[in-house]
Curated annotation (Swiss-Prot):
Keywords: ATP-binding, Cytoplasm, GTP-binding, Hydrolase, Magnesium, Metal-binding, Nucleotide-binding. Monomer. It is found in: Cytoplasm. Belongs to the TRAFAC class OBG-HflX-like GTPase superfamily. OBG GTPase family. GO terms for cellular component: cytoplasm. Pfam families: GTP1_OBG, MMR_HSR1. Its EC number is 3.6.5.-. Its main location: cytoplasm. This is GTPase Obg. Residues 160-328 form the OBG-type G domain. It is an enzyme of class 3 (hydrolase). NCBIfam families: Obg_CgtA, PRK12297.1, PRK12299.1. It comes from Synechococcus sp. (strain CC9902).
Length: 329
């Protein structure tokens, strides 16, 4: 399935039905009064979070969503049928913003959460409303009102508690694959991961925690370089980051600094998010050299650094213990 995490749509509420001018025409009622009914209200357009959806792909080709119009009123003060509500399903974690102003209108996180994206117009009034002592046979009625019409920006931000970050080829996809049932594409070249991968890792209690493998960052990602803003947004909701550094890199300390700089440049509090610094691919470093690499990273970051091999399955239980401790589970 193609992963689409941004979409622009237009929503239009249904137009209200017109009221009508009508008069009672019944036997034995020679001077029947006004009986024009009101128009039905236009239908609303509603966005609803659905846990079965994982992408905004449905909005790639369909951009305009319009609810039904209300029907005109009828004689004998009959109100017209209101337009049906149009419900649009979106993935949980979808933010809804006004396209031109950028104002946040809603954040649909929990399944079933709803947001009215365009209200339908009110129905017009029939002439029965205009009966008065001065005017016993009013002809006046009003037309229905147009529904609202809004241009919207939808942005999907994945609902993962733990985000795995690092430069391309740091081993993020391998780690999420061995910790969970996720099966991301894995190969030995940069940018193998072009979409975020989600995996569920079981806690000691048996409950699941969602991990997200975020596509590799590069220098300038916060300004849009590489995969840039397209995927940095997906770690905004995480409670904890696992920052992987490739032990086989020519300069692990510089790799660390690049990612930290991008987190700082992007903002949204990411650089201050709780983070575990992890040296991966320990099998690529001589045992005698490993303490020096770890010390360099600890001095540069001011953090404790753990050491694993995702490919070999080394020290993964210790890593998970650190994760659960940070999450308080």
């Amino acid at each position: 399935m193609q992963f689409i995490d941004q979409a622009r749509i237009s929503t239009r509420g249904g137009r209200g039905g017109d009221g009508i001018a009508a008069f009672r025409r019944e036997k034995y009622v020679p001077a029947g009064g006004p009986s024009g009914g009101d128009g039905g209200h236009g239908g609303h357009v509603v966005l609803e979070a659905d846990s079965n959806l994982q992408t905004l792909l449905d909005f790639k080709y369909k951009r305009l969503f319009a609810a039904d119009d209300g029907k005109r009123g009828g004689p004998n003060k009959r109100t017209g049928v209101s337009g049906r509500e149009l419900v649009i399903k979106v993935p949980c974690g979808t933010e809804v913003r006004h396209l031109t102003t950028g104002i946040l209108l809603g954040d649909l996180i929990e399944p079933g959460t709803r947001l009215v994206a365009a209200f339908g117009g009110r129905g017009g009034l029939g002439n029965a409303h205009y009966l008065s002592n001065r005017n016993r046979a009013p002809e006046k009625f009003t037309e229905g009102r147009d529904g609202e019409e809004w241009p919207l920006q939808l942005e999907l931000k994945l609902l993962a508690e733990v985000g795995i970050i690092g430069l391309p080829n740091a081993g993020k996809s391998t780690l999420i694959a061995v910790l969970s049932a996720a099966r991301p594409k894995i190969a030995d070249y940069p940018f193998t991961t072009l979409i975020p991968n989600l995996g569920v890792v079981r806690r000691p209690s048996g409950d699941g925690t969602v991990f997200a493998d975020i596509p590799g960052l590069i220098a300038g990602a916060a300004q849009g370089a590489g995969l840039g803003h397209d995927f940095l947004r997906h770690i905004e909701r995480t409670r904890l980051l696992i920052h992987l550094v490739d032990a086989g890199s020519d300069d692990p300390v510089e790799d660390l600094r690049v990612v930290e700089q991008e987190l700082k440049a992007y903002g949204h509090g990411l650089v201050d998010r709780p983070r575990l610094l992890v040296l991966n691919k320990k099998e690529l470093v001589q045992e005698s050299d490993l303490p020096g690499v770890l010390a360099d990273l600890e001095n540069a970051s001011g953090r404790d650094v753990s050491c694993i091999s995702a490919a070999m399955g080394t020290n993964l239980n210790e890593l998970l213990e650190n994760v659960w401790n940070e999450l308080g589970v």
